[in-house]
Amino acid sequence: GRLNCIDPSSAIYLAESKLKKYDNAFFYKETVDACSLENESQDFGYSLGVLHHIPDTQKAIKDCAIKLKKGAPFLLYLYYDFEDKPALFKLIWKLTDLIRLKVISKLPPRIKKTICSIIAITIYYPLAKFSRILEILGLNVENIPLSDYRNKSFYIMSNDALDRFGTKLEQRFSKKDITNMLKNSGFHKITFSNKTPYWTCISYKA
């Protein structure tokens, strides 16, 4: 087998270093719309936490579909738009989003990374562990911000804080939005995970 990894950013080099012991892994510093892989050549595809950071997510999904063989599975994760959350939760998110847009995402890379690490230490970690304690006590923690991180490592929190606050462009989608984009891209048999983080789904190229 052969694993083809594609990323337009320098993150591709980190992936390469992590997988360097595998001689069947190949790396392409390319965008999906200009990818050098042949069309309809791939047995499967996945995109986890990338396509919500680009301007035209619909087109990007179509570009992914072009590279897949008929019947190939495609695993996708996109930020969801908090469609099932209460008004207070959404208000808190909007306030943090303003901080991201107006301040943090505009900082130089090193300062940005430091600020996001501080956010992970002072906000992500305490709220996550508070949610864990409440869960142990038998309380429902679904509507507590960052409760999804209650069983995750600090490394994940730190990485996600940078991904969340360090990027200038972030899009969010409802389950219906994602379903429509996948169907418009030629996918069917779409199944969504009922577990957080939302939305993760598997579909197949028709």
What kind of region is each of these model predictions?
Residues G1-C35:
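Class I SAM-dependent methyltransferase SAM/SAH-binding core
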Residues K20, P55, K69:
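Short conserved AdoMet
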Residues D33-G45:
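A short acidic, Gly/Pro-enriched loop at the edge of an enzyme's catalytic core
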Residues D43-T57:
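A short SAM/SAH-binding and catalytic strip from SAM-dependent methyltransferases
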Residues Y46, Y79-T96, D148-K168:
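Short, glycine-/aromatic-enriched active-site segment of Class I SAM-dependent methyltransferases
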Residues Q58-P73:
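A short glycine-rich, Lys/Arg-flanked "PGG" loop and its adjoining helix->strand segment in the class I
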Residues P73-S117, I121, I133, L137-G138:
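Conserved class I S-adenosyl-L-methionine
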Residues P145-A206:
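C-terminal lobe and adjacent flexible extensions of AdoMet/dcAdoMet transferase-like proteins
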